Amino acid sequence: MTTAPTIGVFALQGDVREHLGMLTGLGVEAIAVRRPAELDVCAGLVIPGGESTTMAKLARTFDLFEPIRQRIKEGMPAFGTCAGMIMLADRIEDGTRDQETLGGLDITVRRNAFGRQVESFEGEIDVVGLDAPLHAVFIRAPWVEAVGDSVEVLARVEQGEAAGRIVAVRQGSLMATSFHPEVGGDSRVHRLFVDLVTEER
C-alpha cells in the first residue's frame, strides 16, 4: 500500500485553512508551509488566493521564494488559485512595476481582470477531468490572456461579459485556477491536483 503524499499549503497569506481542510478530506497529509524545512517534506504545494505582490514579499521575507522556485524548476507539482495563479505565471498584465512571480506556467495573466469587469461572481463551468459542471467562485480574480503551446486549457467562463476567458490551466506538473475551489465544499479540483501529485511521485 502506497502512503498518501504530503502536500503543503503556502501559509503566509490566503485561504490556508480551507485548502488544508480540502486536502485532509481527500486523505492527504496536508501541512502549512511557512519555512523552507516544511517545504522540504512536501511532494506538492498549493499556493492560495490572497494578494500576489504581498505574497511574493512575504515569501522573500521568510526565505521561501527561491526554495519554492527551485522546487518548481525541479518538477514539484504546484497548484495556484487566484493570486496563486499569478504567482505561477511567467508573465503578468497590469502587475506592479517590480512584481515578482515564481513562474513555471507559460501563460500571460491579467491581474484583477474580473475585479474591473464584474467584481466577484459565481457560475457553473465545465472543467476538463470532471464528470459534471463545477460551481466556481471568482473573487477579484485574474484571467489568462494567452497560453503557450504546452499549456492545456482546463476551463473557460461560459456566460456573461467574460464568456470565453480562460480560468483554469495545466502544464506538466503545474495547475492553476482563477477561481477559489476551496470555497463551497466541492473537492473535485483538489482531487485533480492530488492525482497529479501522486502520478509525479
Curated annotation (Swiss-Prot):
EC number: 4.3.3.6, 3.5.1.2
Cited Pfam families: SNO (PF01174)
Binding site for L-glutamine: 50-52, 111, 139-140
Record pathway: Cofactor biosynthesis; pyridoxal 5'-phosphate biosynthesis
Keyword terms, alphabetized: Glutamine amidotransferase, Hydrolase, Lyase, Pyridoxal phosphate
GO CC field: cytosol; glutaminase complex
Reactions it catalyzes: aldehydo-D-ribose 5-phosphate + D-glyceraldehyde 3-phosphate + L-glutamine = pyridoxal 5'-phosphate + L-glutamate + phosphate + 3 H2O + H(+); L-glutamine + H2O = L-glutamate + NH4(+)
Domain of life: Bacteria
GO biological process, one term: glutamine catabolic process
Residues annotated as catalytic: 82, 180, 182
Annotated GO MF terms: glutaminase activity; pyridoxal 5'-phosphate synthase (glutamine hydrolysing) activity
NCBIfam families given in the database record: PLP_synth_Pdx2
Quaternary data: In the presence of PdxS, forms a dodecamer of heterodimers. Only shows activity in the heterodimer.
PANTHER family in alphabetical order: PYRIDOXAL 5'-PHOSPHATE SYNTHASE SUBUNIT SNO (PTHR31559), PYRIDOXAL 5'-PHOSPHATE SYNTHASE SUBUNIT SNO1-RELATED (PTHR31559:SF0)
Role description: Catalyzes the hydrolysis of glutamine to glutamate and ammonia as part of the biosynthesis of pyridoxal 5'-phosphate. The resulting ammonia molecule is channeled to the active site of PdxS.
Record-stated family: Belongs to the glutaminase PdxT/SNO family.
Annotated protein name in UniProt: Pyridoxal 5'-phosphate synthase subunit PdxT
Organism: Nocardioides sp. (strain ATCC BAA-499 / JS614)
